[in-house]
C-alpha cells in the first residue's frame, strides 16, 4: 500500500536501520519536505478502513486547515494512529478519499512532498552526536542547512555535540522532535510527542509548534495524553472505536 514514488526513500531509511541495529520507541521523521511557502489543507471524505471484517475507521469526514494545531486523543486501539498513517499516504483507506491541496492521494498514488512523517521504531545512531544524526537524515533530501539543524536542536534545548549513546529517554525524545522539524515541513504528523518529556520540554515543544503554526504548517497530533494536548492544540478531536468526534 506504499506509493511507488515513496519506496526509494523508505528503502534508504530501512537500510540505515538495519546497518546500525539500534531502535527507539518512536521517531518523528521528516521524510518529504520542501522550501516552498505553499499552504497545506487536508480533506478527509468518508474515510473507512477495515482489516478483514473488522472496522478500524468508520466513515470519517473532516478538514484540517493550514496554520492550525489539531489534537486527536483516544485510548490505544481507538484508530488514531491508523488515521495518521492514512493521511501520510503510507496506508490507503478501504473506502473514501484523502485530498491534500486538491490532489486525491489514493487515486493519483502521489505522496506529499511537504510532510513530517511518523515512522515507528525508527533508530537513532548511538555512535553519532545529535547534530550528526540530523546530518545523516538530511542526506536523503538535502533540504536543510547547517543553520537549520543547529536551530532545531537549540529550540528543543539539546546539545549538538553529545553522543546519542549517552542520552536519557527524554533526550532521545528531544532528538526525535528535532528530526521532525529541522526541514520545516508544511504538514507535521506527531504520534505521542509528549512521551518521556518533562514540563520544561513540553513548553519548548509548544513554542516550536506555535512557530510552525505561524508559518502556516498544518499540525496533527495523536495522543492519549488529554491534559497536555489541551494546552498544545487549537482544536481537539476524540477518536473512539474508529469514529472521530469534534469536541470544540
Regions found by a protein language model. Give the residues of each.
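The feature captures the beta-strand-to-loop junction immediately N-terminal to the Walker
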Residues: 73-75
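Helix-to-loop junction immediately C-terminal to a conserved catalytic motif
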Residues: 88
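Conserved ABC transporter NBD signature motif
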Residues: 96-111
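Q-loop/switch helix immediately C-terminal to the Walker
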Residues: 121, 127-140
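Catalytic Walker B motif of ABC-type/P-loop ATPase nucleotide-binding domains
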Residues: 188-192
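H-loop/switch region of ABC-family ATPase nucleotide-binding domains
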Residues: 223-224
Amino acid at each position: 500500500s506504499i506509493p511507488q514514488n515513496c519506496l526509494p526513500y523508505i528503502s534508504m531509511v530501512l537500510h540505515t536501520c538495519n546497518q546500525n541495529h539500534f531502535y527507539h520507541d518512536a521517531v518523528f521523521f521528516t521524510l518529504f519536505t520542501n522550501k516552498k511557502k505553499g499552504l497545506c489543507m487536508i480533506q478527509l471524505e468518508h474515510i473507512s478502513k477495515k482489516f478483514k471484517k473488522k472496522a478500524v475507521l468508520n466513515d470519517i469526514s473532516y478538514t484540517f486547515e493550514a496554520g492550525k494545531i489539531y489534537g486527536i486523543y483516544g485510548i490505544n486501539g481507538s484508530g488514531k494512529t491508523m488515521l495518521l498513517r492514512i493521511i501520510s499516504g503510507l496506508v490507503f483507506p478501504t473506502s473514501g478519499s484523502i485530498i491534500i491541496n486538491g490532489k486525491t492521494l489514493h487515486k493519483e498514488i502521489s505522496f506529499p512532498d511537504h510532510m513530517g512523517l511518523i515512522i515507528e521504531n525508527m533508530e537513532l545512531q548511538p555512535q553519532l552526536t545529535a547534530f550528526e544524526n540530523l546530518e545523516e537524515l538530511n542526506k536523503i533530501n538535502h533540504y536543510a542547512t547547517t543553520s537549520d539543524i543547529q536551530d532545531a536542536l537549540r529550540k528543543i534545548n539539546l546539545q549538538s555535540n553529545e553522543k546519542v549513546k549517552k542520552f536519557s529517554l527524554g533526550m532521545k525524545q528531544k532528538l526525535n522532535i528535532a528530526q521532525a522539524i529541522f526541514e520545516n515541513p508544511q504538514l507535521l504528523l506527531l504520534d505521542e510527542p509528549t512521551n518521556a518529556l518533562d514540563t520544561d520540554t513540553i513548553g519548548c515543544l509548544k513554542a516550536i509548534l506555535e512557530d510552525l503554526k505561524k508559518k502556516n504548517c498544518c499540525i496533527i497530533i495523536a495522543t492519549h495524553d488529554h491534559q497536555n494536548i489541551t494546552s498544545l492544540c487549537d482544536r481537539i478531536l476524540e477518536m473512539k472505536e474508529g469514529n472521530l468526534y469534534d469536541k470544540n
